A protein has these predicted regions:
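Cytosolic, long alpha-helical scaffolding segments
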Residues: 1-181
């Protein structure tokens, strides 16, 4: 953790909010035009994806706030808890990279790898919480830290869910464009 990195996350989230507003306004205006069936599907899919990307940025702020609270209260995870959260963080970085790369490059093969990773992250989330409860019962972790761990895990899980949504929108759009024709 560093203040510079935390501020960078906050600055980027503020930019994402501005981009979200502008892109959503543009796509909404565009959707009111006389679009082809294909273009209409693409605009709708983009609107959903943009919303999910914006929500991911909101969760990044929540993560920063949790880490800042840990520093302020001088709380640290146990060695095992830190290892688990580092693994969880690496999985989240992986799913974010896959999702953004798939979206930017319209890479369907990469998009197909997101959902299986999201399911692994779901299991990792359950394991982290279960292991934390064991440490709590053994007195190896505090209740305050447990609440922060729960907040971090929830935000990580939601980031993974939004990544999954984006990948699914991409795959559904491709399927609709391949297998559906507009009504006469």
């Amino acid at each position: 953790y560093s203040e510079e990195k935390a501020q960078d996350v906050i600055d980027k989230e503020n930019r994402v909010d501005v981009y979200d507003d502008k892109i959503t306004a543009y796509l909404t205006k565009l959707s009111s035009e006389n679009l082809s069936y294909k273009d209409s599907l693409q605009v709708t899919s983009l609107l959903h994806c943009i919303t999910d990307f914006e929500r991911i940025s909101d969760h990044s702020i929540n993560v920063v706030e949790s880490v800042q609270q840990m520093r302020k209260e001088n709380l640290t995870f146990s060695r095992k808890g830190e290892e688990e959260m580092n693994l969880y963080g690496a999985a989240i970085r992986d799913i974010l990279t896959r999702t953004t790369d798939a979206f930017v490059n319209n890479d369907q093969a990469l998009a197909h790898t997101v959902e299986p990773l999201e399911e692994v992250i779901d299991e990792l989330n359950k394991d982290v919480k279960k292991h934390h409860m064991k440490r709590l019962r053994k007195g190896k972790c505090s209740m305050e830290l447990g609440l922060l761990l729960s907040d971090l895990a929830m935000n990580y899980e939601r980031v993974a869910d939004h990544c999954s949504n984006i990948a699914v929108y991409m795959m559904q759009l491709k399927d609709c464009l391949l297998y559906t024709s507009p009504s006469p």
